[in-house]
């Protein structure tokens, strides 16, 4: 059975959270259990080095990647030095890597997938973790495509409704069939102003009815035929 696209997938692991909890200092470990994580990424390489070689020194407070960080990333590194050390090790490698891009404790994180080539870093995807759920952020192309499809559908429905209401008569030309609108119950504060609304509506309906009685479609057709048969007089 084919797997759904990653941008349509929601993943969570209650068992993992029950065993280890979910906090900022282990959110990347939680993310690495999801199908969004690439097992060939540099994060996995660094993790294997930590587990088997045990050669990584303790994280010093001054350890920082070479690139100048943003204020938000600087705050993450200051509060969680392990992430500063992780990105220092990732900066030595080339390829796919995952970094913690945004933190809003206690239940929202953004993980960024990026490709590193020396000092050049290209963002590929963002993933957001809300509570225990992990999602892939949609691309700008997917968002625009969805909005255009929705706009086209509703525009087509509106044009179809307008076409069904359109009528054409030789004497009167194009017109639209009147549509009855459901009356809306006014609020209690507008009782005085709404009292005159039925009277005004009745007056307008009466005037429209009288006009339609005088100028019927048959009369308009006869007037048009008479105007066609008449001889124009030019001054």
Swiss-Prot record:
GO CC annotation: core mediator complex; mediator complex
Chief localization class?
nucleus
Please tell me whether the keyword Membrane is annotated for this protein.
no
Instruction: Report the coiled-coil segments.
Output: none
Provide the alphabetized UniProt keywords: Activator, Nucleus, Transcription, Transcription regulation
Top-rank taxon, per record: Eukaryota
Kindly give the InterPro entries that the UniProt entry links to this protein: Mediator_Med6, Mediator_Med6_fun, Mediator_Med6_sf
Question: Where is it localised?
Answer: Nucleus
**The keyword Transcription belongs to this UniProt entry's keyword annotation:** yes
Q: Name one GO molecular function term.
A: transcription coactivator activity
Q: Which GO terms describe its biological process?
A: regulation of transcription by RNA polymerase II
Which PANTHER family does this chain map to? MED-6-RELATED (PTHR13104)
Q: What does this protein do?
A: Component of the Mediator complex, a coactivator involved in the regulated transcription of nearly all RNA polymerase II-dependent genes. Mediator functions as a bridge to convey information from gene-specific regulatory proteins to the basal RNA polymerase II transcription machinery. Mediator is recruited to promoters by direct interactions with regulatory proteins and serves as a scaffold for the assembly of a functional preinitiation complex with RNA polymerase II and the general transcription factors.
Protein family per UniProt = Belongs to the Mediator complex subunit 6 family.
The subunit structure is:
Component of the Mediator complex.
Q: What name is this protein filed under?
A: Mediator of RNA polymerase II transcription subunit 6
- What organism does this protein naturally occur in? Eremothecium gossypii (strain ATCC 10895 / CBS 109.51 / FGSC 9923 / NRRL Y-1056) (Yeast)
**Taxonomic lineage of the native organism:** Eukaryota, Fungi, Dikarya, Ascomycota, Saccharomycotina
């Amino acid at each position: 059975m084919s797997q759904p696209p990653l941008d349509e997938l929601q993943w969570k692991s209650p068992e993992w959270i029950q065993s280890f909890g979910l906090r900022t200092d282990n959110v990347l470990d939680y993310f690495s259990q999801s199908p969004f994580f690439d097992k060939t990424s540099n994060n996995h390489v660094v993790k294997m080095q930590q587990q088997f070689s045990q050669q990584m020194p303790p994280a010093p407070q001054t350890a920082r990647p070479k690139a100048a960080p943003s204020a938000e990333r600087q705050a993450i590194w200051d509060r969680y030095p392990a992430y500063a050390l992780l990105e220092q090790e990732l900066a030595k490698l080339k390829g796919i890597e995952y970094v913690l891009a945004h933190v809003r404790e206690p239940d929202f994180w953004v993980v960024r997938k990026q490709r590193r080539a020396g000092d050049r870093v290209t963002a590929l995807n963002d993933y957001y973790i809300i509570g225990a759920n992990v999602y892939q952020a949609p691309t700008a192309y997917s968002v625009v495509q969805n909005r255009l499809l929705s706009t086209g559908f509703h525009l087509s429905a509106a044009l179809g409704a307008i076409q069904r209401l359109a009528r054409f008569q030789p004497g009167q030309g194009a017109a639209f069939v009147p549509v009855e609108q459901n009356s809306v119950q006014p609020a209690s504060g507008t009782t005085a102003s709404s009292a005159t609304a039925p009277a005004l509506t009745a007056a307008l309906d009466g005037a429209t009815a009288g006009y339609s009685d005088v100028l019927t479609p048959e009369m308009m057709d006869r007037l048009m035929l008479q105007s066609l048969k008449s001889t124009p007089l030019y001054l």
